[in-house]
Amino acid sequence: MEQAWNLHFYASLNRLKEKSQYREVVVTNQAEEPWLIRNGARMLNLASNNYLGLAGDSRLKEAAIEAIRTYGVGATASRLVVGNYSLYEEVEKSICDWKHTEKAMIVNSGYTANVGAISSLMGRHDVIFSDKLNHASIVDGVKLSGAKQKRYRHNDLHHLEQLLQTTPSEKRKLIVTDTVFSMEGDVAHLKELIALKEKYGALLMIDEAHASGIYGERGAGIAHVEPELSKKIDIHMGTFSKALGCYGAYLAGNEVCIDYMRNKMRSFIFTTALPPGVLATIQCAIAIVKEDEARRKRLLENGAYFRNVLKEAGYNIGNSSTHIVPVIVTSNEAAIRFSRKVQEAGIVAIAIRPPTVPHNSSRIRFTVTSEHTKSDLEWAIRQIVNIGKEEGFVE
């Protein structure tokens, strides 16, 4: 029996290798820095989600150490048992102040937040409208809910409305979207999505994982670029593991919606709570991003510079308008070759292939941070452009 299973595993892995979709993990150190250590070499880090450089911030480290001294290392239980430390209540109040919502709840990760929220809100008699390029956690949440799924073409509001029009009015409806799309670097049209959700009586849930801490008033997210919009969004989800440099995620909205999810969400109920040290770093990070406008501004400037120069050099960066800059090279083999070449040049940037992105859109996903210097980015661009010319990606 064991041999039969192993043969199945080997065959499956070999098929991935044949399609250039096999994945490996590589030991990396100092990934919280603009320059990291990988395979013993010092390399420029253009692959990290540490957008504001807070993962290595001394203030967050001290907050974690102090909380561990006070509360210990582990939460000891789920929040519904004895894991609901006072820190949870304090941080959730901070989130409400930051996001201007009635209530918030902290969840262990962005994945468990999306999977849990969507599957608790919707059921087999309901309909979910999901952008085709939404994150995998949204896709999995929709599947787990058992609801009928209607996927609309990426950022295509006309297609979304067509799908809404053909759905019986009595059906409960949820529209769900990323705000900053993690593999595209473009942004959802929230104002228009709000208009559609109001017209057709749907709930609207947004995933601010790659926007929280960066965009909008006090870094509260894309929903807060125009403050009046945020109050019209039913469920806000975001993570602390990217721009805030910590771990975990939040769900925020009105009081009854959050209370409902606390009572229905299996990924909240049946898991041990986050450690106190993590909660303390979240509290510290929120305080920093709310006030540190200069750090957010540096990130946006770095993103615009990197994006514009690569586009001018002839690279296909899609519709990116953020700090996430994909260079689309179509085939899996080309993406792997490109990634290998940039890493040989001293840059960490990873090939992204199906199923993470659609077929024939494999790419290198570059991400810049506020902590990259102009000289870092100038040097990287020279390497990337030279490689592109050598490999025929640009003329």
Swiss-Prot record:
Q: Keywords on this record?
A: Biotin biosynthesis, Pyridoxal phosphate, Transferase
State the needed cofactors, names only: pyridoxal 5'-phosphate
Which pathway does the database say it acts in?
Answer: Cofactor biosynthesis; biotin biosynthesis
Tell me the GO molecular function terms. 8-amino-7-oxononanoate synthase activity; pyridoxal phosphate binding
Q: Where does substrate bind?
A: 23, 135, 356
Question: GO BP, one example?
Answer: biotin biosynthetic process
Name the protein family: Belongs to the class-II pyridoxal-phosphate-dependent aminotransferase family. BioF subfamily.
The name of this protein is Putative 8-amino-7-oxononanoate synthase
Binding of pyridoxal 5'-phosphate, residues: 110-111, 182, 207-210, 239-242
**Which gene specifies this protein's sequence?**
bioF
Post-translational modification N6-(pyridoxal phosphate)lysine, affected residues: 242
NCBIfam families per record: bioF
Can you state which reaction this protein catalyses?
Answer: 6-carboxyhexanoyl-[ACP] + L-alanine + H(+) = (8S)-8-amino-7-oxononanoate + holo-[ACP] + CO2
Which one Pfam family would you cite for this protein?
A: Aminotran_1_2
Q: How does it assemble?
A: Homodimer.
InterPro entries given for it? Answer: Aminotrans_II_pyridoxalP_BS (IPR001917), Aminotransferase_I/II_large (IPR004839), AON_synthase_class-II (IPR050087), AONS_Archaea/Proteobacteria (IPR004723), PyrdxlP-dep_Trfase (IPR015424), PyrdxlP-dep_Trfase_major (IPR015421), PyrdxlP-dep_Trfase_small (IPR015422)
